[in-house]
A protein has these predicted regions:
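N-terminal export signals
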Residues: 5-26
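Non-catalytic accessory segments flanking enzyme active sites
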Residues: 50-128
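Proline/glycine-enriched tight loop/beta-turn segments at coil->beta junctions
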Residues: 121-122, 131-139
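Cap/lid segment of the alpha/beta-hydrolase catalytic domain
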Residues: 143-230, 287-291
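Mobile cap/lid helix-loop segments that gate and shape the active-site cleft of serine hydrolases
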Residues: 212, 216-220, 230, 234-235, ...
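Alpha/beta-hydrolase fold nucleophile elbow
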Residues: 245-254
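Short beta-strand/loop motif that positions the catalytic acidic residue
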Residues: 322-324
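C-terminal catalytic histidine-bearing segment of alpha/beta-hydrolase fold enzymes
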Residues: 341-342, 347-382
Length: 382
């Protein structure tokens, strides 16, 4: 072997990938081996964003001392939240509602329907009316979280079969509404279930279309939350067309992403008489700000003006019950308790502290309803 061959061999070995022996530490990236020479915290984007949070002005956070001041605060913050959500889609001049199917079950009747929320945009929903009550019924707009969409809350399994075991983390809570003598108006949120694009539908029932749709909304200066709130408002319009439902006794409830929709809808829509938020009330800081969440949760610039507890405070003095799992790993329980304490202060300034409640339970991110459903029934009573 010539000197030139030896030189080539040496050069090749120097350029070859370094093989780590069994038991050796895994390669950690470009700073591997240089950790002691740098401040690792200065490379952490979450720590960077948390420092920015500390400087967030929260210009419209609650600080009122009496009801008059609280009402003035609500007016300002409600207008700002509407602005931040972006303009709502245009409402169709008529709902063009259509019944697709009616089925009878032992404890309730279920009607599948559609209506036009915005020109060219339909909403699918299910009206579940109880057999243990007399019309006109209180109506609870019921919004599912991420999963298979509205099927997850009306008693339909992943094969399209009826079920009675209340499976999944959402436990068919729309069916549970009827068991408490109220009607459930369960809607399919945009980008969930049947309201997904064809490409996303090919990926399976559990794959939401929040990406790219929520991103598209942001590029348009709008938000997925705004679109979903608008659908809730139009659902309440639809409720007003049904003689078996009482439009003066409308509630709203949802879990997770449905809890997001419920909180913002109740904050902005005065026709919602009572609300139940499951698996969502927390702080932005400790949930969607710090943990990996779906893009449908984000409202650009909101931390310049308010925290989540401030938005929830816009519901006051209308009744609000929040529930939180003590093992919830995406909406941490301690932050949920902190947030509710701030919401409670708003209700107390209104002189209605008893109308705000928080139930915690020994489980993960899931629907519970032990206190929440009786709470809605009590506050939506005729």
């Amino acid at each position: 072997m010539t000197r030139r061959d030896l030189a080539k061999l040496a050069a090749g070995s120097a350029l070859a990938p370094q093989i780590r022996l069994p038991g050796a530490a895994a390669y950690t990236g470009a700073l591997d081996g240089a950790e002691s020479k740098v401040d690792l915290k200065s490379f952490d984007p979450v720590l960077f964003s948390r420092r920015l949070y500390q400087a967030a002005p929260l210009r419209l956070t609650f600080g009122a001392q009496n009801r008059k001041q609280a009402e003035a605060w609500q007016k300002k913050l409600r207008a700002k939240v509407l602005e931040l959500l972006g303009p709502f889609p245009a409402s169709s001049p008529v709902l063009n509602s259509q019944t697709l199917e009616v089925r009878d079950f032992p404890g309730y009747r279920r009607e599948k329907f559609i209506f036009e929320s915005s020109p060219g945009l339909n909403v699918l929903g299910y009206l579940l009316t109880p057999k243990n009550a007399t019309p006109p019924y209180a109506a609870v707009v019921s919004v599912p979280g991420h999963g298979r969409g509205v099927d997850d809350i009306i008693g339909v399994d992943e094969y399209g079969r009826d079920r009675t075991d209340k499976d999944g983390y959402q436990h068919d809570f729309a069916v549970q509404v009827t068991e408490h003598g109220m009607a459930a108006v369960a809607i399919e949120p945009i980008a969930f279930g049947c309201r997904r694009d064809p490409l996303t539908k090919k990926r399976g029932l559990k794959q939401s279309a929040c990406q790219p749709v929520a991103g598209a909304a942001l590029l348009l200066g709008q938000t997925m939350i705004g679109w979903r709130v608008h659908d809730v408002m139009r659902t309440i319009d639809w409720i007003g067309t049904r003689k078996e439902l009482d439009p003066a006794r409308v509630g709203c409830m949802g879990i997770s992403g449905g809890g997001t929709c419920t909180l913002f809808s109740a904050a902005l829509e005065p026709r919602i008489r009572a609300a139940m938020v499951s698996g969502y009330l927390c702080t932005f800081k400790d949930s969607v700000f710090s943990l990996s969440h779906c893009i449908d949760n984000y409202v650009p610039g909101i931390l310049n003006w308010a925290e989540m507890y401030d938005v929830a405070g816009l519901i006051a003095p209308r009744p609000l019950l929040a529930e939180s799992g003590e093992k919830d790993n995406i909406f941490p329980i301690e932050a949920s308790k902190t947030s509710f304490a701030r919401v409670k202060k708003v209700y107390e300034v209104f002189g209605m502290g008893e109308r705000a409640a928080h139930e915690t339970f020994n489980d993960a991110h899931s629907f519970y309803g032990k206190a929440g459903l009786p709470f809605l029934k009590r506050h939506l009573a005729g």
